[in-house]
């Protein structure tokens, strides 16, 4: 049985560490958030959404594979910016069910966040070529490449 408060606390701790790391990278390479795409698979997707949407300085875009929103009530209170978001999920995912993509899409739409989604047929909890290609095109479009 999941303890949602424990999960939320741990995700906040990880988010803080992730933001510190991103700040270090931004400083080392003289980057702003507008030059960064956050991306992740499974828990990495969850952290990319939390990190990307709770920073006051918007990221260029967020790409998430096979993830979900960790705690909708918590994230609702903490959203500070928007980014173009692409969520990709396999319809046969038995680790993080595909229904999480639809829930995340609904949540993001209600928060006026530009969301794109792709469900990959006959795909489990992995990133097939079709997902990588879709993500690459989305990233290139967002960076005008």
Language-model features, listed with the residues they occupy:
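Serine-hydrolase catalytic machinery in alpha/beta-hydrolase-like enzymes
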Residues: 1-31
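Alpha/beta-hydrolase fold nucleophile elbow
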Residues: 30-40
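Gly/Ala-rich beta-loop-alpha elbow adjacent to hydrolase catalytic centers
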Residues: 39-44, 48
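Active-site signature of alpha/beta-hydrolase-fold catalytic machinery across serine-
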Residues: 50-54
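A conserved short beta-strand
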Residues: 57-69
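Short, proline-enriched alpha-helix->beta-strand connector loops that line the catalytic pocket
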Residues: 80-85
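Short beta-strand/loop motif that positions the catalytic acidic residue
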Residues: 86-89, 93
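C-terminal catalytic histidine-bearing segment of alpha/beta-hydrolase fold enzymes
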Residues: 102-145
């Amino acid at each position: 049985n999941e303890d949602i408060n424990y999960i939320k606390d741990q995700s906040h701790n990880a988010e803080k560490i992730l933001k510190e790391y991103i700040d270090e990278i931004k400083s080392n390479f003289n980057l702003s958030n507008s030059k960064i795409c956050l991306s992740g698979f499974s828990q990495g997707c969850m952290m990319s959404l939390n990190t990307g949407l709770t920073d006051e300085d918007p990221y260029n875009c967020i790409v998430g594979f096979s993830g979900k929103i960790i705690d909708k009530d918590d994230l609702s209170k903490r959203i500070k910016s928007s980014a173009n978001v692409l969520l990709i999920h396999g319809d046969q995912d038995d680790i993080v069910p595909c229904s999480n993509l639809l829930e995340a899409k609904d949540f993001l739409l209600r928060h006026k966040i530009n969301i794109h989604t792709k469900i990959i047929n006959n795909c489990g909890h992995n990133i097939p070529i079709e997902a990588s290609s879709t993500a690459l095109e989305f990233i290139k479009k967002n960076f005008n490449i």
